[in-house]
Amino acid sequence: MNTARLNQGTPLLLNAVSKHYAENIVLNQLDLHIPAGQFVAVVGRSGGGKSTLLRLLAGLETPTAGDVLAGTTPLAEIQEDTRMMFQDARLLPWKSVIDNVGLGLKGQWRDAARRALAAVGLENRAGEWPAALSGGQKQRVALARALIHRPGLLLLDEPLGALDALTRLEMQDLIVSLWQQHGFTVLLVTHDVSEAVAMADRVLLIEEGKIGLDLTVDIPRPRRLGSVRLAELEAEVLQRVMRRGHSEQLIRRHG
């Protein structure tokens, strides 16, 4: 196991991380510490830097300035410990379900792929084609494909956004259950504030490339939908987001 891994999860430390695209500053000297094994949700308005943060952590982009560390090790040096899920499951239609789970692996991987499919409730669909699966089932396959690598860091970029309400709730429960079993660190980007407070230990609001709100979700698990405390935390985040939006409208109106 890599020395940067603690308790099976990857600890993250971002020091003054910035990301610029020409004159557009997306992340602006962002500082962030995430302990190993924590479940963090990231919310904010479109264009605020949420997905850019995930792409930096996934190694898909490099920061303009600053350090991205796993403990004391540059995260880029242990990128094999990181896996990412998107809103689109990105399954190859010409490969079977089990072959999609084992994509890129060598050696004797099929038993591990079957265990990963069993963990997401699809052990009986291993030989089928992706076209035979529902949207929720395809996302379960994508989750199994991430699990087979035993990640220390799981990055989720709106993975449930295209699902119907009931399937979305089932997937939320599944992801939380697997996180509790395996102890990996999770960063979930979502536009759904209720989803953020229902799933995460901690909710971050990114505004103008910085952390505008860092909220601890102090509710024991399993969490009950409709609880007063969940509603209070959701309202706190939404009020902050809306207050910022109102201020921007006033500036445009009177500037």
UniProtKB/Swiss-Prot annotation:
Its main location: membrane. Pfam families: ABC_tran. Transmembrane segments: none annotated. Keywords: ATP-binding, Cell inner membrane, Cell membrane, Membrane, Nucleotide-binding, Translocase, Transport. Residues 12-233 form the ABC transporter domain. SMART domains: AAA (SM00382). ATP binds at G44, R45, S46, G47, G48, G49, K50, S51. One of its GO terms (cellular component) is plasma membrane. It is a peripheral membrane protein. Its EC number is 7.6.2.14. It is an enzyme of class 7 (translocase). One of its GO terms (molecular function) is ATP hydrolysis activity. It catalyses: ATP + H2O + aliphatic sulfonate-[sulfonate-binding protein]Side 1 = ADP + phosphate + aliphatic sulfonateSide 2 + [sulfonate-binding protein]Side 1. Signal peptide: none annotated. PANTHER family: ALIPHATIC SULFONATES IMPORT ATP-BINDING PROTEIN SSUB, TAURINE IMPORT ATP-BINDING PROTEIN-RELATED. NCBIfam families: PRK11247.1. Part of the ABC transporter complex SsuABC involved in aliphatic sulfonates import. Responsible for energy coupling to the transport system. Belongs to the ABC transporter superfamily. Aliphatic sulfonates importer (TC 3.A.1.17.2) family. This is Aliphatic sulfonates import ATP-binding protein SsuB. It comes from Shigella sonnei (strain Ss046). The lineage of its organism: Bacteria, Pseudomonadati, Pseudomonadota, Gammaproteobacteria, Enterobacterales.
